[in-house]
Amino acid sequence: MSTASSSSSSSSSQTPHPPSQRMRRSAAGSPPAVAAAGSGNGAGGGGGVGCAPAAGAGRLLQPIRATVPYQLLRGSQHSPTRPPVAAAAASLGSLPGPGAARGPSPSSPTPPAAAAPAEQAPRAKGRPRRSPESHRRSSSPERRSPGSPVCRADKAKSQQVRTSSTIRRTSSLDTITGPYLTGQWPRDPHVHYPSCMKDKATQTPSCWAEEGAEKRSHQRSASWGSADQLKEQIAKLRQQLQRSKQSSRHSKEKDRQSPLHGNHITISHTQATGSRSVPMPLSNISVPKSSVSRVPCNVEGISPELEKVFIKENNGKEEVSKPLDIPDGRRAPLPAHYRSSSTRSIDTQTPSVQERSSSCSSHSPCVSPFCPPESQDGSPCSTEDLLYDRDKDSGSSSPLPKYASSPKPNNSYMFKREPPEGCERVKVFEEMASRQPISAPLFSCPDKNKVNFIPTGSAFCPVKLLGPLLPASDLMLKNSPNSGQSSALATLTVEQLSSRVSFTSLSDDTSTAGSMEASVQQPSQQQQLLQELQGEDHISAQNYVII
């Protein structure tokens, strides 16, 4: 007995776990439970397993809570700092609590080091019995009360049990980093969530529904392995990738058919319909010029069928279009000879210009003043055609630069891959810029000579003429040799001067003051005006009218 108690005390001193001390305090607070536990352990003989038949009441089972450090110590038996025999002795010593002296029977005089493995086996047998007993203890009313110290100790011990169980399940760093560095993620065979390893950002909602169905089926049947699931998922992903590749190929083929996006596609479609059908509301010749020619058709993505249609119409339009007469003007204005000539070259349009001028000279002039001579094929003409033919007649081979789209007209004709009408527009712009100073006075309002001449002359003419006239009337009235003529002239000049002064009073005072100073400085002009006024009345009236 003394040896067992000393060994238990020494082993308990070796265990640094505070839950055993906490359990002793809680057990000391309930002495009848401790006595009952001691009697139960004594009745159990050499194993201390007699707690199982003493499970009649909840109070008698309280000391079994000391088995939690035993589980912790079992998890740490393989630690290098503690030998397995000492760990087993420590676990046995910390198990019964205050009734440890009564635990071993007096008929076993074995030393503690030898008795520890013998007692460990029946305790291992009694371990599965603790789980139903713990359920019974959790159903007891004393455990449910939150204020009791027993409940607090149980909470701490249950947390320790959870942490110890999770510590057992985790694998070492070598098992994790080894396959991870080789490119293989470690898989847990017991958990059925490898389907969740997909990223939902790359999946569609239909795939999410399939994943949910897979999860449910895998949870019900545990015979499914993770390898089968991964194979199915890989097959599904391959199918999805093939579908996406096919759709992307279709879209790329569509884009190859029309590499120039935007309005070029619509222009080509409208040209096709306009060339095939007679009622076409287009009346602008600048829209279909670009893509009618043979070589740029391949550049702009028009199919060879449309190209054949254009070529057939170019060949047979001169025969068909002459008997046709369309009064509504709904036909697309596409002259056949111009289209056939524009298909011959990419870089320059000089042959088309020559052919167009020759064809315009060969055609008979139209009756209507708004139609050019080329409108015999039944197509209505636009103002651009009219201006184009006027420029042809005047000797310039260019329409107006209304549609010149290049920002640098001097350099854009160097690009050989541009559409042919771009080259024509560049030429038009250069020639119009060179001819602009000749025809500028017809269109522009102010001239540089006139602008410089206005402040010195025309705007201030009446003010300068009124300056010498104001003192001239006084001189005429004072120094008049003939009274009759002077009175008539005086009445005429005073009336005219009063009307003139009333007109100039609305102007600036500075101008009148300047005119007065000018009249004082120029007396010779006053004498000349006196002679003119005395000479002839109508001459003075004409002078005022001219001013």
From Swiss-Prot:
PANTHER family recorded: AGAP011572-PA, GLUCOCORTICOID-INDUCED TRANSCRIPT 1 PROTEIN
Chain intervals with Polar residues compositional bias: 265-276, 339-356, 505-520
Region (Disordered): 1-55, 72-285, 319-417, 505-530
Regions of compositional bias (Low complexity) in chain numbering: 1-13, 26-38, 86-105, 162-177, 236-245, 357-369, 521-530
Protein name, entry field: Glucocorticoid-induced transcript 1 protein
Phosphoprotein as UniProt keyword: yes
Phosphothreonine modified-residue sites: 110, 175, 177, 266, 343, 350
Compositional bias segments (type: Basic and acidic residues): 130-145, 187-201, 319-331
Coiled coil segments of this chain: 225-254
Pfam families: FAM117 (PF15388)
Domain of life: Eukaryota
Tissue-specificity statement: Predominantly expressed in lung, spleen, thymus and testis and, at lower levels, in brain, bone marrow, peripheral leukocytes, skin and trachea.
One GO CC annotation: cytoplasm
Residues modified as Phosphoserine: 20, 79, 105, 107-108, 171-172, 223, 258, 303, 345, 394, 398, 406, 412, 480
Compositional bias per record (Gly residues), positions renumbered to this chain: 39-50
The species this protein was found in: Homo sapiens
Keywords for the protein's UniProt record, in alphabetical order: Coiled coil, Phosphoprotein
Signal peptide as annotated in the record: none
